[in-house]
Regions:
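Aromatic (tryptophan-biased) beta-strands that constitute blades/sheets of beta-rich domains
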Residues: 48-67, 99-107, 143-147, 191-197, ...
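Sec-dependent signal peptide cleavage junction
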Residues: 15-27
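Repeated scaffold domains used in trafficking and secretory/extracellular systems
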Residues: 63-74, 108-117, 151-159, 199-212, ...
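Blade-loop segments of beta-propeller domains
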Residues: 53-91, 95-115
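Conserved beta-strand positions in repeat-built beta-propeller and related beta-rich domains
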Residues: 31-36, 81-87, 123-128, 166-172, ...
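Loop/turn-rich, solvent-exposed surfaces of beta-rich toroidal or solenoidal domains
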Residues: 201-278
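Short loop/turn segments immediately following beta-strands, especially the blade-tip
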Residues: 44-50, 136-141, 178-187, 229-237
């Protein structure tokens, strides 16, 4: 009964989030990793707040140090949320019910990013393990890797539906892989060497879609925020609105169809890599709005959207 009541509450909150923005206008939803509470949280930041009145959904994890989150649609399970945390844990849960549909305790050390590939394979990038591991989803619990590739300081993975490749960042490298799952359950991963390139600055950290331009990717490093153009292979720094992103240490970033940008960087109050404030740039231009929460310390922020691009 409690689970049914909770599910009804989540559905009502989602409806309220859409209603509050007016007819035909989509709310600005974010998913964020609350490391101080070991929770995934989804907020509607349309009104510039992160509190109990704008909390849409939350999910408690069994381990601390939640590092990555993605919202995707699975042909098998419907809408799902994927996350990695602890030293070697990853899972995929149904949304909004929060039921585990896949999990593993076999990522490489310090997992940072996770992605659901449409063929049914899950990729996990781990920074201390210098590795991306690939898992099939046929086993619900304690899934073991079916393939792996080496990438120094692996921090981000993102599927590209247009090019049918998995983009990945680590160290000062951006590269991409084809991933296939055959009828026998074997996973084959091949690096697309022609897409491998050096990032101009070191310590690549986040990799995210630019929803308003599918030919671009967000890439953050220890010192800079880039928009990478896939066609020209250019790391663009002086894009429109870059003045509001002229900062170092951005841990998570994303943008909406209208160009609005959300990002987070550390304040060091809880951990050296977490912060209490999400920054929001309306339509990508102007000064960022600081949206501070008093109930958590966060690491990664994501635009809450099932689309890959």
């Amino acid at each position: 009964m409690k689970k049914i009541v909770s599910l009804i509450f989540v559905i009502l909150m989602i409806f309220a989030a859409f209603s509050s923005t007016g007819c035909g206008k989509q709310p600005y939803l974010i998913a964020i990793t609350n490391q101080s509470k070991a929770c995934l949280e989804v907020y509607d930041i349309t009104e510039g707040r992160m509190d109990e009145t704008t909390l849409v959904w939350s999910y408690k994890l069994p381990y601390n140090n939640i590092a990555g989150v993605k919202f995707r649609h699975s042909d098998v399970h419907g809408d799902v949320v994927l996350t990695v945390c602890g030293n070697n844990y990853g899972c995929m849960v149904s949304y909004p019910a929060g039921e585990i549909v896949w999990s593993t305790v076999s990522t490489a050390a310090n997992p940072h990013s996770i992605e659901l590939i449409p063929c049914g394979v899950i990729a996990v990038a781990s920074s201390d393990g210098d590795e991306i591991r690939f898992f099939t989803t046929e086993k619900q619990y304690n899934s073991k890797p079916s393939a792996s590739v080496t990438l120094d300081d692996a921090h981000g993975v993102l599927w590209d539906e247009e090019s049918d490749v998995l983009w990945a960042v680590g160290g000062n490298i951006l590269t991409a892989y084809t991933v296939t799952l055959d009828s026998d359950g074997a996973v084959t991963v091949t690096e697309e060497v022609s897409l491998r390139t050096e990032i101009p600055t070191n310590s690549a950290h986040d990799l995210a879609p630019v929803y308003e331009n599918t030919d671009e990717l967000w890439i953050t490093t220890g010192s800079t925020v880039y928009r990478y153009n896939k066609s020209t292979k250019a790391f663009v720094y002086d894009y429109e609105g870059h003045e509001g992103l002229d900062i170092s240490g951005v841990k998570g970033i994303g943008s909406y169809d209208d160009g609005s940008v959300v990002y987070i960087y550390p304040d060091g109050e809880y951990q050296s890599w977490t912060g209490k404030t999400v920054y929001f740039i309306k339509e990508g231009v102007g000064e960022p709005m600081a949206i501070t929460s008093e109930s958590g310390h966060f690491y990664k922020v994501r635009v809450f959207d099932t689309r890959y691009q």
